[in-house]
Amino acid sequence: MDELYFYDCNLNIKSFAGMLENPTQCYKFFWLDSIMQLVARGENEFTFLEVFAGMIADAWYAVKEYHLRLGPKSVDGTSSNLLERAVNKISENVDVKNDESRDIIIEKIKCNSKCVNSEMQDLAKNVPYRLLSSFVKELGGNNPLWSKTGKLISYFEMINKKRCLLYTIENGRGLTKKVVINKLWNNFLIDNMVTIRGWIKMKKIKYLQDRNPGVPGLIYKLEPEKDKERKLENVRKLWDCVIDINGVGFKDIYSK
């Protein structure tokens, strides 16, 4: 049955689907979605800084406008989530609106990356590597190799020659390390962009709802709603036409 999980040229879709399983924090969702948005722009190589800036920008509205919890609290009651801390640090040092566009927020983060350097460095220790754990199950979650990023990068390179990993990591200093998307996976990501991003969003919402149980309509609190999507003019026109064609017989059950 395992062969059913291969898309093209030994792309293991089962391993891909396993990337977002059993999260202890929300970072996997934001990391993968940030990568997807870069791929959608035609990029297949990008620095850790670029991906992290996208992650922080994607968390911005939920944290600033609705104060959603992105992860568990620390013992003292403060947030232990690095994305929450990064959003709050940037907002304390830079003038950015709660509903600012994603592209502008990303540029602000890049220009002021020093003030969230510690958060991004902490993210860089595990997130880029652990996302690939479903592709390298032979390592096991407690394998000491996970804490040795240099050797881990070399290991990924070796494994990628035997079976296609989603990406490999090009070594460098700190946040200049690069994510390099496998060309075969790149085609898969582009072909299935809408489906994959919808799947990531579903997983993200489930995780966040568990940490914000009293928040209704959480799906609408992750990003600003575009005005054009809120306009009901076309809907009204449609129902005006339906009423004209059918005449009487429609009853308003809401206002009467």
Spans of features found by a protein language model:
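Mixed-charge, low-complexity interaction segments
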Residues: 1-255
